[in-house]
Amino acid sequence: MTFLMLAVSLAIPLLGAMMLLESPIDPQSFSFKEPPFMFGVLQPNTKLRQAERLFENQLNGPESIVNIGDVLFTGTADGRVVKLENGEIETIARFGSGPCKTRDDEPTCGRPLGIRVGPNGTLFVVDAYKGLFEVNPQKRSVKLLLSSETPIEGKKMSFVNDLTITRDGRKIYFTDSSSKWQRRDYLLLVMEGTDDGRLLEYDTVTKEVKVLLDQLQFPNGVQLSPEEDFVLVAETAMARIRRVYVSGLMKGGADMFVENMPGFPDNIRPSSSGGYWVAAATIRANPGFSMLDFLSDKPFIKRMIFKLFSQETVMKFVPRYSLVLEVSDSGAFRRSLHDPDGQVVTYVSEAHEHDGYLYLGSFRSPFICRLSLQSI
């Protein structure tokens, strides 16, 4: 009894202190459907472990990857856009300045995320903090197309994330994941369930910006269809991909392309089979346990977690399960590539197909992975 009384006497003031602490998030309650069973084309495997790591410990957070010929380009966590050729890394652009060592440096340093090749061999890049840029890789010149400081329909852009561009280079479709949360607080955005993300359209000729879809929960990767009639948008926090029609008879409409995915989707890129590659750094295991699914309708617990623990601490409890899905042009799962405990591929953010290989980006790993499609 004495021990019990002591425990209670300690617990009551501790709980009181916890209640007085402010939580950085005001989580909303929502619920997921039961995740799809991981069998058939979703059956867990170790195919991603056949990948090889490139530039290990020479690149930090190569989120998105493009190629011009056999030359690769990516953006890194220290604010650079780099060229990768013949085993060498060369910086071709920076959008920020100053030290780039901690999360507090990110807004000043800049953080290049989505990257695409335009029709004239220039690179179009979004920086999470700075906006939309065009980079000439030969001249090393940088042109600001749209600043994050520019309000769009009265709302600022706090987390510019990914982009996709028409073949003629006129229209750029891009995501702003939140007007409240910045990239460095992406876990708070996911846990809060903030629905202030948007899909936007930028016209490179008129400089006009339009909001195509709003009230999205962490809109992330985007991909224009081969016919350029719709744009796919990964709504990460809801484990789904939306389809927004941008031309043709359906223009202005939107529907669901893939619902109730087995992972939380990041970037979307075309596959040579006419479908799409979708990367997911966190899965919704079934059978198994998904922390995000469990917490989705428990805002009180989420609030308490972030009263007590930092984002980095919480990330340590997220399984390092990398998943790459290939989906058809109608949204059906074609195949899945797994690294169940992140032995080789970790924190995967994108699968970029080129010349028989998948080049796998990551939002926090210090390398790129390359996987031969013939080997799987």
UniProtKB/Swiss-Prot annotation:
Keyword match tRNA processing: no
Transmembrane regions listed in the UniProt entry: 1-17
InterPro entries per record: 6-blade_b-propeller_TolB-like, Strictosidine_synth_cons-reg
One Pfam family cited in the UniProt record for this chain: Str_synth
Disulphides: none
Gene Ontology CC terms: cell surface; membrane
One Gene Ontology term of the molecular function aspect: arylesterase activity
Membrane-topology descriptor: Single-pass membrane protein
Protein's cellular compartments: Membrane
Domain of life: Eukaryota
Keyword terms: Glycoprotein, Membrane, Transmembrane, Transmembrane helix
Main location: membrane
Glycosylated residue positions: 120
UniProt xrefs under SUPFAM superfamilies: Calcium-dependent phosphotriesterase (SSF63829)
Entry similarity comment: Belongs to the strictosidine synthase family.
Function: Exhibits strong arylesterase activity with beta-naphthyl acetate and phenyl acetate. May play a role in adipocyte differentiation.
Name assigned to this protein: Adipocyte plasma membrane-associated protein
Species for this entry: Rattus norvegicus (Rat)
Originating gene: Apmap
